[in-house]
């Protein structure tokens, strides 16, 4: 039997696994994909994330995980009235495939057992343990643990099966392109005008590739909004696309007013986006790392008392939720579409 089975080797899961393994706990970190695996994400690590990585992983984000330009200098936001706001801070530009693998390798170095290409299909709780059904290739089997940490993110199934709740989603679509544009590649740009998206539209650069994307509530309208955004970028910023290299679609958790957080059910605890932590513009890495660490600390401090674990985790994670509320409140002042997010 494991002390803890962690599902999902993203920032939340790997941080929780490393934190608990360093405490001497027997930890299984199960990742359904082959690593390194692609993750649809801007890969812009803000200063807060860089500080957390140094604090919890003992070293700076390595250059091997980064793409060019390696330095991110902040965010430039355009509100729904066309006004531009510049928020400068130091950050890094990474490929999530490389960054997430590095985090999982750090968990493995702390003696967490990492099971790659292993999906968690279901879990069944008892008073003293959790039975998890896992599948690796054609082999389906079960493992037991005292606790489960669900860090699968928005596309995971364990939480939906446990709670019976179907989450609300935001659909994202982005393309990677060869071309040129009259914007500074060191910044992440976002636009909140309602004619360009139903959530936000964005631009950033990764290894010379121009990344352009939109997010919508109604997935059937994504092509319409994307075409409008491209036309806007051509007119306003001199976008010229020579060749589209890649496209992807993804889902985001739709954050509701009050930024509700679901910390877990019984012996199954939720971290990162699974719990509901997600900041504006899809920035979730900082809260994923911090929630994973705080969950691991709460679990270790009260290991024999599941109710105390859940309570301690909720208390420890409250500052993350408060930070999230403040961030969404700021965006609510920039776009009427987010008016219900005012504090």
What role is predicted for each listed range?
Residues 9, 21-41:
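Glycine-rich FAD pyrophosphate-binding loop
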Residues 297-343:
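C-terminal helical "tail/cap" subdomain of flavin- and related membrane-associated enzymes
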Residues 1-10:
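Beta1/beta-strand and adjacent pyrophosphate-binding region of the FAD-binding site
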Residues 106-239, 277:
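Predominantly flavin-linked oxidoreductase catalytic cores and closely associated redox partners
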Residues 13-14:
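N-terminal Rossmann-fold NAD(P) dinucleotide-binding loop
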Residues 33-75:
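N-terminal FAD cofactor-binding segment of flavoenzymes
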Residues 220-294, 298, 303-304:
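FAD/FMN-dependent oxidoreductases across multiple families
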Residues 85-106, 217-225:
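Short beta-strand to alpha-helix junction loop
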């Amino acid at each position: 039997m494991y002390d803890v089975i962690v599902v999902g080797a993203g920032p939340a899961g790997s941080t929780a696994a490393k934190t608990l393994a360093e405490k001497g706990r027997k930890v299984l970190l199960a990742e359904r994909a082959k690593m390194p695996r692609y993750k649809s994400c801007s890969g812009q690590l803000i200063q807060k994330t860089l500080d957390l990585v140094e604090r919890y992983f003992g070293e700076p984000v390595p250059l091997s995980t980064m793409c060019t330009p390696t330095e991110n200098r902040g965010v430039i936001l355009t509100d729904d009235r066309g006004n531009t706001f510049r928020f400068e801070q130091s950050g890094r530009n990474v490929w999530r495939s490389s960054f997430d693998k590095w985090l999982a390798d750090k968990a493995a170095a702390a003696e967490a057992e990492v099971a790659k290409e292993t999906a968690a299909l279901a879990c069944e709780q008892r008073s003293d343990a959790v039975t998890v059904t896992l599948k690796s290739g054609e082999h389906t089997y079960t493992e037991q643990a005292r606790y489960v940490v669900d860090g699968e993110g928005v596309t995971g199934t364990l939480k939906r099966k446990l709670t019976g709740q179907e989450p609300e989603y935001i659909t994202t679509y982005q393309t990677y392109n060869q071309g040129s544009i009259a914007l500074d590649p060191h910044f992440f740009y976002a636009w909140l005008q309602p004619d360009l998206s139903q959530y936000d539209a964005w631009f950033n650069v990764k290894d010379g590739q121009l990344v352009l994307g939109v997010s919508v509530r109604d997935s059937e309208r994504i092509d319409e909004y994307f075409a409008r955004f491209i036309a806007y970028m051509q007119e306003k910023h001199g976008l010229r696309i020579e060749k589209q290299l890649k496209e992807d679609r993804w889902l985001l958790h739709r954050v509701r007013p009050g930024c509700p957080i679901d910390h877990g059910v019984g012996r199954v605890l939720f971290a990162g986006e699974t719990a509901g932590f997600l900041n504006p513009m899809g920035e979730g890495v900082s809260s994923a790392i911090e929630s994973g660490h705080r969950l691991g600390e709460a679990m270790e401090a009260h290991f024999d008392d599941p109710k105390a674990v859940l309570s301690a985790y909720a208390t420890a994670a409250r500052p993350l939720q408060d930070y999230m509320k403040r961030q969404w409140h700021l965006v609510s002042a920039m776009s009427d579409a987010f008016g219900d997010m005012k504090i």
